[in-house]
Amino acid sequence: MGSFKEIVNTVSNPTILFTSVVIIFPFIFPPSDWFEKWHRRLGLHHIWSKKAIIIAVIGMVAFFIYGLGDYNFQKIVLKPDNVPISGLIFLVVFFTWLAMNQAYSNDERLDDGKKPSEFYEAPNDKVLVWPDLVYVELISLIIASAFLLVWSIGLAAPIEEPANPTESPNPAKAPWYFLGLQEMLVYFDPWMAGVVMPSLILVGLMAMPYIDRNPENSGFFSYKRRRMAISLFMFGWLVLWIMLIIVGTFLRGPNWNFFGPFEYWDIHKLEALTNINFSEIIYIKWLNTGLPDSILLREIWGILVLLGYFLILPPLLAKTVFKDMYARLGSARYSIFVVLIIIALTLPIKMYLRWIFNLKYIIAIPEYFFNF
């Protein structure tokens, strides 16, 4: 079984894990007809069946039980701070499956000329607040309170000793809900990773249903009729947020190095890494000259790259990949949509640039505290 642990540790390397997820994702959540064709041909639509969720839950439970036999895995997973993230994995998997299962079921019903499962004709199209809703909320409140009571008794609160200014924890991790931001800080300047990126990702996720409006398909679960919007939403939610939290919780160890879930957290593990800016690649590596004294001349190449990315890419996408969406949304809504998308995509782009080229910043102007 040692080889199995080695395989898991290897696959858990974020460069391999993230690349695999990015490649597989559009086949699981197809955004277009081409991906939909392969989605069906590969039988991936069956993962939203009831049998699939049973197999998935059993598989995850079996993996966790097996992993608890390993000291390193047990130490990470059973840490009181990390227990909620273990639960988060199960909850995200289940509720993603639940929504997609209902969406696929409704798509089949609509294709057969039937009404969606959420449709009720009068007078049965309303649910009374009292007693129906209040009873359900009361029962949920009691169950949640009992669960939290058992949790608080069974798990010691992760409260440590008063902060010692002479001793820094290694690794120093933020609370789980900020671990996604802490992971972004590896690839972006603090103003970008701590304020701009998370704000735009959250605003983009909230704005998606309003940008891609479709009144005829509102009020019930459906995937087929809003594939592009749902696929992009799920990518932002699952890959750019949930996955970063999981990576920061389980795979980041001492000195903020990557470790597999079965790997010993060696505090002396050091990886030789020298990050360089885009201007240094251009002038020092390619042109074999020193950096110019002029800030504008030094950073002109990075500025041109970003201008091309933000000014040329949107109209290019409007004529190719997003051609149908541009016709449906119009110029104003499409502009908002595509700007939010390409800003969100700067995160995986910067991640790959760091992993492949050790690129730190495309534009680096520390004189004015502006780095991107």
Regions found by a protein language model. Give the residues of each.
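Soluble extramembrane regions of membrane proteins in the secretory/endomembrane system
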Residues: 2-7, 74-80, 111-113
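Hydrophobic cores of alpha-helical transmembrane segments in multi-pass integral membrane proteins
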Residues: 9-38, 46-72, 81-107, 116-121, ...
